[in-house]
Amino acid sequence: MAGLYEDAFVEQLRQGLVATAHEWGLPPHASITTLNLSENATFKAVDPETGHPVILRVHRPGYHSRTEIESELAWIHALRRDGIVTTPKPLPCGNGDAIAVMQAAGAARRVVAFEFMSGAKPDAQAESIVPAFRELGAISARLHAHARAWQRPAEFRRKVWNYEAMLGSRPLWGDWRDALGLTADGRATLERACRVLDEKLTRYGEGPERFGLVHADLRLDNLLVDGDRLGVIDFDDCGFSWFMYDFAAAVSFFEEDPIVPALQDAWVEGYRTVAPLAEEDVAFLPTFILLRRILLTAWIASHAETPTAQALGSAFTDMTIQLADAYLTQAERSLANQQG
């Protein structure tokens, strides 16, 4: 993974795209620049003659299978066809294939293309963030209703984001115990929090009314605001998980911000304009927030070379421990009140 964030490696990927751009009708002299480096590498290609931009996503080898990528694209096509959400159109290659394969940095790498979508990510500090979350709640409800009703292709395959895949015995994003700056006391707090999360989620269950196909990464970086339109991008993490997990993903990296309760209220309000939402589901939102936060702590631990991890450092781990401690304290109070 370390090579993904070195300039020389990124340049090899870019050169690979230069040689592959013809698959989408782009000329060899198209301008190709880096947009984002995370699980994958995302680039923006612009035809200098037309000025038309295309988004190119280079997949990390060994993470998603071809079938998983095709499944993501199948859901996006269905969502667009059914008018569920504004999201960029996947662009097939000239031969009709959904996925191109390029050789770069000594490996075959899958590439998919999308239309460019205008807009800017919501600002968590702006007054507009609350109405944006109200709209996001409505979008989430539509996504969840579609996921429940959609007849998936027989070969549809996406990862399952349950407790075991997040924090349990087969973590997809690494082990939070390797977190930057984690102390013995901090580890004990998180171990205790994980036990409580596991117990609560087991009781909550994975029935079809609570668990299904979700975007799973509706954080601010994957939302684009343009006027009154709130668009959703990057379905790369979509998979099977709890529907309420989508709210937790939306407050990624700022879970401790005092505005989160107001955002939760707005999200729930927006959700209920589209579909019913039980109070028990709402009551579980703090559980999913902590689940996501510890998962992000694991991701940072396993991606310590990334710009995100380096910017957040051990302070992110410290805040995760504080959030876990506050969650445990609240859980103890709730239990005492029930027993009293």
Model-based region annotation:
Residues 46-152:
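ATP-binding pocket architecture of kinase catalytic cores
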Residues 94, 123-185, 209-211, 318:
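A cross-family kinase active-site recognition segment
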